[in-house]
Amino acid sequence: MSIEFRELYRKPEEGSKNKLVVVTGISGSGKDYLLSEFAKTDYRIGTAISVVNFGELLFSRLRQVDPGNDMVASRDDLNRSVSQDVIRVLVNSVVDEVIARQPAIVNAHVAYMQQGSIQINPDVVRKMAVTSFVYVWSDPELIAEWRKNDYGRRRDPEAPEDIILHQRIALESTRIIAEVLGAGFRAVYNRTDNILENISKLK
């Protein structure tokens, strides 16, 4: 088990960080698939250790407080149909739920697109007091292709050159936040042919 995930199995100590590992990266970088394959290698993942999709929790919370909002049909609509003020309020309640479900692996965006601009909220990860971050990144052309072929999602189109900038900002932001908060950090380069190699880095 890598140092990033090993802390999830240890008994909590007074004053220690929460037993949370955030797996992050821009949309379409392969986080979901990597996590699903990683979970198959350890029966405790999904049972003793929760696997939480922050965006899905956020979407569910919005449906609870505003069930008549037809503009938001999935988590992909959160970044274009919900104001930043509403998102901020909902995020705080979702963070409380995530903390309550630790130890957990959290699939989340540290830097995310909100109505056409990249948003970063270090207060959220500071409140979560995570053990470590795992940043999943990939080739921009490959990300664009994965997004195109993922018919179950409704992502906004993004050219490869924009993906380069978005991915670099997200990567460096996550690295800096981890350093400032004293959390662990690991970057994983994701390709179609190295899933087993990446899983071995996390085990």
Which stretches of residues belong to each language-model region?
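ATP-dependent small-molecule kinase phosphotransfer cores
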Residues: 50-118
